[in-house]
């Protein structure tokens, strides 16, 4: 099977080339705004008709080369389609930050031997150096580069390249370890594996820092000035970057601390936002804005690269079912003191650990080729095995 990841490559430029790249990126962004205005007026998302009506104007007004003009039109159309899919209404996107979309072997190329990045600009092709550290593995014969984005941040240039490569699938006969992962707020992740080991990833620091960012935004919202709104946007972006780094560290630790042939079993939290009415008003923002999906995505692609697999199962009753005797009752769990105590057999443990144990048990019952069909099996339907203490 194929996997695509986005690799980040730093471009090293001298002052003269820096100005050329800045001018090209600015012209490209201005052209995107021009096309965005045309589409907003016409509501036309046909690439053929948009290209027919704007291609020559883009080249004449902004000086873009042929492939750049076509890439500009594709970028704007894709942006509109994303907005319509998510917002269900016409909102005009504005391209404020300078950017440049580059097609592999047409607009840009990379020379791994000499560490040279060749790119088309308004002034023709230029060649600059790039930092190859951490990128060497992508220069193998099996890797294919896609349309990259050149961006500038804090005076530095970075190339974001989608890289597609082949990976071997993990057959169910090679699964030797099952890890149940319970995600939450008090603990970002709690795991339970086939050797009976439990690991807790504490979330208190993350919770406190997010509360700090929320208080800052609330204070700035009361000011209501343009500068305060810019500050709010910057704080939100900083928080997102920091949270993504936390998810990266956790997913990396999970993958590297488990051997090849590991099956990670997670709860399917697709409808977590729909459950807000069961959460106290003051806790709703924290609950619905938690980055469960980001951690899931990072773990999924990292696991595939290490000959591991991640699947999702129905989370119903995972926190109410005793992993020792199978008794399911809401009263088994005491949320206030974060403790699970079975009303039938008396088995007691941390409630998040119980969730991880039940997910581990459900993972052992899954057949990987039938994982999609078995995703909605519940904890109460799985045969109970006595866990290691």
What are these regions (language model features)?
Residues 1-389:
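Nucleic-acid substrate recognition interfaces
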């Amino acid at each position: 099977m194929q996997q695509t990841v986005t690799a980040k490559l730093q471009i090293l430029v001298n002052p003269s080339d820096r100005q050329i790249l800045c001018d090209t990126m600015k012209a490209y962004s201005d052209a995107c705004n021009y096309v965005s205005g045309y589409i907003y007026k016409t509501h036309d998302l046909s690439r053929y008709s948009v290209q027919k009506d704007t291609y020559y104007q883009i080249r004449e007004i902004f000086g873009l080369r042929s492939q750049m003009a076509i890439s500009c039109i594709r970028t704007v159309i894709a942006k509109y389609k994303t907005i319509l899919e998510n917002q269900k209404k016409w909102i005009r996107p504005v391209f404020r930050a300078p950017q440049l979309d580059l097609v592999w072997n047409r607009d840009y190329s990379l020379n791994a031997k000499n560490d040279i990045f060749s790119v088309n600009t308004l002034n023709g092709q230029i060649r600059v150096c790039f930092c190859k550290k951490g990128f060497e593995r992508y220069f193998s014969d099996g890797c294919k580069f896609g349309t990259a984005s050149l961006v500038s941040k804090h005076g530095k240039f970075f190339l974001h390249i989608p890289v597609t490569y082949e990976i071997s699938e993990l057959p169910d006969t090679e699964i030797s370890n099952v890890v149940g992962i319970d995600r939450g707020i008090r603990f970002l992740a709690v795991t339970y594996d086939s050797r009976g080991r439990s690991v807790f990833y504490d979330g208190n620091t993350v919770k406190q820092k997010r509360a700090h960012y929320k208080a800052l935004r609330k204070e700035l919202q009361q000011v209501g000035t343009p500068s305060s709104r810019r500050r709010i946007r910057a704080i939100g972006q900083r928080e997102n970057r920091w949270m993504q780094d936390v998810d990266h560290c956790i997913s990396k630790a999970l993958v590297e601390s488990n051997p090849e042939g590991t099956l990670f079993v997670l709860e399917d939290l697709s409808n977590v936002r729909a459950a807000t009415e069961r959460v106290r008003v003051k806790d709703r923002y924290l609950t619905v804005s938690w980055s469960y999906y980001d951690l899931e995505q990072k773990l999924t692609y990292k696991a595939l690269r290490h000959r591991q697999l991640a699947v999702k199962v129905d989370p119903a009753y995972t926190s109410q079912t005793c992993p020792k005797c199978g008794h399911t009752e809401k009263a088994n769990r005491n949320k206030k003191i974060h403790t699970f105590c079975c009303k039938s057999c008396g088995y007691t443990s941390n409630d998040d650990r119980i969730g991880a144990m039940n997910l581990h048990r459900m993972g052992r019952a899954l057949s990987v080729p039938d994982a999609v069909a078995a995703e909605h099996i519940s904890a109460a339907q799985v045969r109970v095995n006595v866990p290691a203490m």
